Amino acid sequence: MNHATSELHDESAVTSVPETTRIQDLKALVKMGIVNSNTLTVFTGFWLALHFNGLSVMDNLDKLFFTIVGSGLVMAGVCCLNNYIDRDIDPLMERTKTRPTVTGKYKPGFALTFGLVILLLGFVFLLLTTPMAVLMGFIGAFTYVVLYSLWTKRKYTLNTVVGSISGAVPPLIGWAAIDPSLGHPIAWMLFLIMFIWQIPHFLALAMKRVDEYRNAGIPMLPVVHGFEITKRQIMIWTVCLLPLPFYMSGLGITFMVIATLLNIGWIVLGFYGFRKKDDIKWSVQMFVYSLNYLTILFVSMIVVTFF
């Protein structure tokens, strides 16, 4: 890993620090975009657990509050810790060089302390639901901070797969807050969807940002093995999503049709990449599709329960 970044760090901190408010800096520190997107999956897990256990959301508003706040704090905490860990390589990447731990808006010690405090506070909130929700939160946090950020991210191309484990945990946190047995198969389908989805999503991003990852010394798959192998891996993982809706028949035929159409659309776009000459443009299209895919899919899971 290239650690000779002090000059670049100093230069970015002195000459190119963007004008931001304290609130904007705090949002960047906790990666609010990631927190918000994962909150949807937490809520979906919570909602579906209510639905399949015949429970009312109005009777569980307290648990909903503790679940959303607790999981949000856990995710914000691990994102803070990730910013702290990556402060030496973030200046080398265009999309991360303005993070407050790079620009000096927040000192490393603050990021570390603040991250640990809100992480622990998140566990306290989750404990007000069920111990299993805390365990799921801990597994997600440990995987992201230790197994991904500290271990595999800078050493192995499998970093994307390892990181996807932590990103697949949020719906299980939501489900466990209502049903700590996690015995319903749909709970684990949510986990599998999130796990598999993240791999083509982040590999597409890695293709788009391949030069930045190369400069930072991060062994993402397209950096180490090139675009052709990366495109094959993207296709393999995308195809793996195809059968999952059929294990979620409890959500009805409408959801199964929506999910299958989304999967087919992603697969078709994926195959198109083998005929397209502009790999970067294709990777952007795949990345954007993946974002819309996840939002539509998880919102659909909630909507179909009303009919």
From Swiss-Prot:
Keyword annotations: Cell membrane, Heme biosynthesis, Membrane, Transferase, Transmembrane, Transmembrane helix
Main location per the UniProt record: membrane
Lineage, uppermost ranks: Bacteria, Bacillati, Bacillota, Bacilli, Bacillales
Protein name in the entry: Protoheme IX farnesyltransferase
PANTHER family: PROTOHEME IX FARNESYLTRANSFERASE, MITOCHONDRIAL
Record organism: Bacillus cereus (strain G9842)
Gene3D superfamilies assigned: UbiA prenyltransferase
Gene expressing this chain: ctaB
Subcellular location: Cell membrane
Assembly mode: Interacts with CtaA.
